[in-house]
Amino acid sequence: SKIAQEVEPIVNPNTLEKPNLTIGYVPVNDCAPFAVAWEKGFFRKYGLNVKLTREASWATSRDGIIFGRTDAAPVVSGAVTNARIGAEGARHAPLCAAMTIHRHGNAMTMNRAMWEAGLRPWREYNGNLEEFGRDFRRYFDGLPSEQRVWAVVLSSSIYEYFVRYLSAAAGVDPLKEFRVIIIPPPQMVTNMRIGAMQAYMVAEPWNTRAITGNEGVGFTFAQGKEIWLGHPDRLLGVMESFIEENPKTYRSLVKAMIEACRYCGDPNNQVEVAKIITGRSYTAAKPKKCRAPVVINEDNIQSLPKCITKFTGPGIIGEYNYGGFDQQKRIAKSLDTTIFFDMPANIPQEPGEHSTFLWRSRSVWLMTQAARWGQIAQIPGNAEELAAKGWRADLYREIAAELGIKSPKEDYKVEPPEVFIDHKGFDPSDPVGYLKSFEIRANRPSQFFMA
């Protein structure tokens, strides 16, 4: 972009092992830091010449890194862990990540039939999992088995785990009561319209697009933060060999992305960021009735009408509409709808914590879920070693410190009960005990009673 070209590099590209990079992204709201790093010149500032490539799905975003088509790309938070442990037949690959792209920014959408059956947004159940479970089971019990379908963006993603976690917390066994299928984000709304699934979980703007006043095919049941407050979503994925062979380049990449995340998280920039990602090169989520230029660039971004952010704005700006089919307004204003850097005060946090910091303990949590749902036979005995190899909090600390950013001193933390929908906390020092505490899980030993 013109703005990027005017940025004076503070790192000489000739000092980098690989200054020319190909970086993937997926057309969802969390492409924002990649778009901003490119449009605002953060890549150029750190000596990088980046070509962005739009990926069709989270599978191609991950596989592009593994097969060397891209140098880096966002991956779902479970991708690095699952490539290390081979969850559900995943290709074993030494994927790494030193930073989170964002936290939150995703939601569960249910179709109109579920609304008409009496289901409502989670916030209207006032924390009553039993009541939700009754409504949920009643609806699915009335469907033939082939229609009991919930869609997510990738197998073994945190979205799949959230769908199963929610269902099990409400007393409905997700291994027996419905199927989980994989659909790329841009295809979710269309597939719901034709009845391919009853519900789905995806990043914005593909939940907002579904509600009344937009596509009108569904309503938002819950944001992901209502399942686990403060959870990580996307990570900046690379291969381990990339870090080893290009240490200076990698530091430049992480610095550029940290700065881009800080820019996206600044409330003063959120409307602009929401406008940028409506561009055809990014989400292409531009309302048809909003009069705006076909091409969105730095020359016209400030003058674009706010209606252009109808789809991308709620998740970025934090005025989130749950929708519904009863003409009632369900708009929740919050600072934590999508978190790119600074942590809102309502989220339990450690000194120095910001959203781009990776907690290795959360990689262990992902392993507990892979084991819980039968994607691996058991939690690996070397879980901490695998987490350390994949989630490079050590590198992040060093790189962030060079930017004057303090980070938490520890790699592990206890997740308190209040952040989970079922109020069951997670102590990473006892992952096996945590796994066994769940009544509903795969491979649970049968109990035999003898008179």
Stretches with model-predicted labels:
Residues 3-181, 197-230, 419-422, 428-431, ...:
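Short, glycine-/small- and polar/acidic-enriched structural segments
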Residues 247-392:
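Secondary-structure end/capping motifs
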Residues 173-178, 244-252:
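Inter-helical turn/loop segments and adjacent helix faces that build the functional surface
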Residues 54, 58, 101, 156-160, ...:
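Solvent-exposed, acidic/flexible segments
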Residues 108-109, 235-238, 242-243:
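Short glycine- and hydrophobic/aromatic-rich loop-to-beta-strand nucleating segment
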Residues 3, 364-451:
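Conserved C-terminal helix/tail region of periplasmic/extracytoplasmic solute-binding proteins
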